[in-house]
């Protein structure tokens, strides 16, 4: 009897302890953060236990999906570039209700949503390592990014950036342009061959996969010393891993309380299986290049990983993790986002043939002035209209729709005291489409590259490559890659929207065309007979 009573008391004590822990984690701790912000006059929707404002977010999303908040259309007149209400309806509705600074919660995670330029300015100027990436998002995206540069914090992040950044300095990028041209010529020639085989002068096709192949080939050649053929499996699996991570169903309560290991989901297991296969393929690539100094990013990472000395099994495993995680990060950042931006750019040029003609004339003048040579780095720098088109594309369709940070200690931004643990969300699309910030002849939601002709963009309201110390280190590389592709495509083709194109931006870690970008390509005779074409 005594044993039974003792067991019952122990069970009751355990239940009380678990209940107290859950109450603290799910309500008390986040409520303290919310109270800290409320005392500063920062409002927001009222959260409920235990999921915060998640039910409201789902309700707003369902209403937007049912009403098609921005037009999904097949005709040019139906295309609306302001996708905020369709993709992020909860943010837009709350911003209109509570102003440019408000707070909301997802489970026990407290978010400070900021679209006030003065606060964004201070965030951009903050170089403290105590402003990092969200611990929750880091855990959620672990199979895709691991401990690589995109999600790491503190000294680990600083070390990785110091190692990787020099590989994307302008002097390095100059030497990569010829490889980019080679990859672009393969793509353009394949499109010409398909048109010739069709027996006509034009072709209606979905361009997304072909552009991803180009972007993947560029990354493989320039950063890892291999061809796309060799790395195709890695790219395909990373794409599949991205889809799995962005759509996998979370057991939110388990994630919030640190008990997710007790409630594994099938989608989570699938992500980790894919991660294992990606890891094995990358290590095979490392093995092939392990004894070589190719002067590329992979070689630099291998040198850094081996710099720790001999060590035991744990050291070797850590070195492998370092190389694998950063390879995945570079593959994703340099491959997916650039390919999506190129697709959006061609879609916008198809909608605006006057800009297409301007860019084509400019490219031919820049390259044919050098005797018809293929574009090199100096020629790319002369392409001002093309630069403006890319800048405007990145304004309307930034790959990263949100800049997210977590306060790893209490910070002050724009007069707002941000307590430790609060996640700061800056909606890039909101800043990029703000009518007050982007005034002038064309509306903020209209395509007008000329807005970049003479004036600098509004300070701290144009964030296509992120903000602050964590600004994308590969932006010079990405701009060169985009210019090479677009210049070669436009010198060989006129592009128009296909009647089958359906405009529907969607957020899948980055903002991309949900149904792909479908164009009609018509061959034109270029004034520049670049090697590899004729």
Curated annotation (Swiss-Prot):
Mind telling me which InterPro entries this protein's record contains?
Cyt_P450 (IPR001128), Cyt_P450_CS (IPR017972), Cyt_P450_E_grp-I (IPR002401), Cyt_P450_sf (IPR036396), Cytochrome_P450_Monooxygen (IPR050665)
What Pfam families is this protein classified in?
p450 (PF00067)
Give the knockout phenotype: No visible phenotype and no change in the levels of 13-OH GAs; due to the redundancy with CYP714B2. Cyp714b1 and cyp714b2 double mutants have decreased levels of 13-OH GAs, increased levels of 13-H GAs, including GA4, and longer uppermost internode.
Q: What function is annotated for this protein?
A: Catalyzes the 13-hydroxylation of gibberellins (GAs). Determines the ratio of GA4 and GA1. Converts GA12 into GA53.
Other comments on record: Overexpression of CYP714B1 in a heterologous system causes semi-dwarfism and increased 13-OH GAs content.
The record's family statement is: Belongs to the cytochrome P450 family.
Please give the name of this protein. Answer: Cytochrome P450 714B1
Source organism of this protein record? Oryza sativa subsp. japonica (Rice)
């Amino acid at each position: 009897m005594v044993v039974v009573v003792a067991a019952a008391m122990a069970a009751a004590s355990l239940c009380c302890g678990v209940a107290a822990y859950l109450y603290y984690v799910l309500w008390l701790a986040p409520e303290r953060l919310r109270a800290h912000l409320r005392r500063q006059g920062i409002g927001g929707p009222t959260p409920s236990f235990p999921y915060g404002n998640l039910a409201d977010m789902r309700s707003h999303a369902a209403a937007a999906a049912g009403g098609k908040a921005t037009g999904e259309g097949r005709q040019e007149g139906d295309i609306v570039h302001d996708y905020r209400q369709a993709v992020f309806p909860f943010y837009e509705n709350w911003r209109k209700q509570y102003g440019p600074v408000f707070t909301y919660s997802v489970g026990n995670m407290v978010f400070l949503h900021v679209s006030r330029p003065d606060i964004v300015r201070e965030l951009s100027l903050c170089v403290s390592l105590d402003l990092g990436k969200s611990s929750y998002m880091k855990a959620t995206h672990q199979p895709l990014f691991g401990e690589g540069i995109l999600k790491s914090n503190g000294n680990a992040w600083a070390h990785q950036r110091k190692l990787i950044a020099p590989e994307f300095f302008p002097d390095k990028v100059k030497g990569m342009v010829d490889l980019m041209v080679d990859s672009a010529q393969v793509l353009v020639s394949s499109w010409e061959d398909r048109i010739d085989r069709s027996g006509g002068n034009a072709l209606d096709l979905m361009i997304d996969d072909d552009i991803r192949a180009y972007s993947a080939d560029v990354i493989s050649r320039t950063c890892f010393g291999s061809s796309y053929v060799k790395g195709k499996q890695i790219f395909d699996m990373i794409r599949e891993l991205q889809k799995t991570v962005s759509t996998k169903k979370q057991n939110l309560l388990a994630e919030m309380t640190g008990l997710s290991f007790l409630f594994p989901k099938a989608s989570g297991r699938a992500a980790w299986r894919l991660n294992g296969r990606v890891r094995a393929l990358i290590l095979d690539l490392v093995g092939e290049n392990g004894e070589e100094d190719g002067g590329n990013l992979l070689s630099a990472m291998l040198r850094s990983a081996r710099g720790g000395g001999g060590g035991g099994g744990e050291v070797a495993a850590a070195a492998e993790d370092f190389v694998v995680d950063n390879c995945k990060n570079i593959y994703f950042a340099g491959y997916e986002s650039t390919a999506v931006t190129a697709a959006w750019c061609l879609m916008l040029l198809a909608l605006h043939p006057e800009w297409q003609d301007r860019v084509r004339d400019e490219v031919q003048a820049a390259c044919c002035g050098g005797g018809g040579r293929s574009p090199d780095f100096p020629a790319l720098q002369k392409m001002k209209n093309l630069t403006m088109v890319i800048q405007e594309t990145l304004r309307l369709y930034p790959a990263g729709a949100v800049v997210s940070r977590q306060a790893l200690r209490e910070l002050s931004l724009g007069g707002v005291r941000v307590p430790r643990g609060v996640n700061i969300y800056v909606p890039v699309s909101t800043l990029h489409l703000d009518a007050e910030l982007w005034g002038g002849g064309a509306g903020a939601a209209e395509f007008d590259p000329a807005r970049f002709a003479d004036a600098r963009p509004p300070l701290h309201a144009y964030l296509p490559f992120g903000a602050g110390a964590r600004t994308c280190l590969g932006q010079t590389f990405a701009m060169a890659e985009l210019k090479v592709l677009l210049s070669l495509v436009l010198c060989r083709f006129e592009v128009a929207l296909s009647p089958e194109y359906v405009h529907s931006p969607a957020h899948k870690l980055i903002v991309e065309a949900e149904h792909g970008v479908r164009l009609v390509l018509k061959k034109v005779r270029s004034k520049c007979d670049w090697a590899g074409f004729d």
